[in-house]
């Protein structure tokens, strides 16, 4: 394994951008590792996180995580925040981890309605995450959950110590050896659904489906959901697609392919793993295999030759 969080860890770079922005908003100067690209060396990341805890205390990492709300628009954050539910957000986060092949994983366990146990753990054969790494991850995920659910999230340890309540962070006990916390979502504000106008010609319907899929490639789309958006029955939608000599699964595959091709051509600095993740593929192998099969070139060869 290299000195990076395994290969193309765009997620680690995003964490450093959040940290840099949060410290800046607090008026605190820190030399945060450059994070404009996809790679952040592990030793640099851990060094700056440990320095933040030493100088400012553990609660500082929780507070700076609030900067995710003011992060300039970027594809990774937008892909996560398009989640429709907390469960959808967790699924997207897990898919992101599949692409980064990082040393750590987040295990989500749903309890009763609105309550989840989050365990920040090591991948097979890796060292445990540091206290600082766990605090930053918990802080960022809590903010994402509050944005997606439009509700406050209470964070507490299994022993009952409260870390966050009423949108305020409190100093965590030191050390946080267990690396498990309980996140409880308050009353969720259900956003009204906006459906497309009633269906028209098959070509128009197909264009609308492509528009829906392209707006959120990471979403686990179901035919029933798209039919509802278009004010159609599933059977009617299938008939419309058949008239266009296509299928729902074919449209999903085409949308992923077009999204990936666009990113490969227009954003040469974006890593291949991030391109695959943002385009909706399940993991790096799925991205490479599917892209090569349909285009005749690997993603890297396509980028080099087009």
Feature annotation, model-predicted:
Residues 1-107:
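N-terminal low-complexity or simple alpha-helical regulatory segments
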Residues 8-12, 129-130, 219:
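Residue-level recognition of alpha-helical structural elements
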Residues 10-11, 40, 133, 201, ...:
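Short, contiguous, pocket-lining structural segments
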Residues 17-22, 139-143, 248:
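Conserved short hydrophobic patches within well-ordered secondary structure
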Residues 26, 56, 145-149, 230, ...:
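A broad structural signal for alpha-helix termini and local helix breaks/kinks
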Residues 52, 65, 93-96, 145, ...:
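Broad structural signal for hydrophobic residues in well-ordered alpha-helices, predominantly aliphatic
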Residues 78-183:
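DNA-contacting interfaces and partner/effector-binding or oligomerization modules
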Residues 152, 159-306:
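Extended mid-to-C-terminal alpha-helical interaction segments
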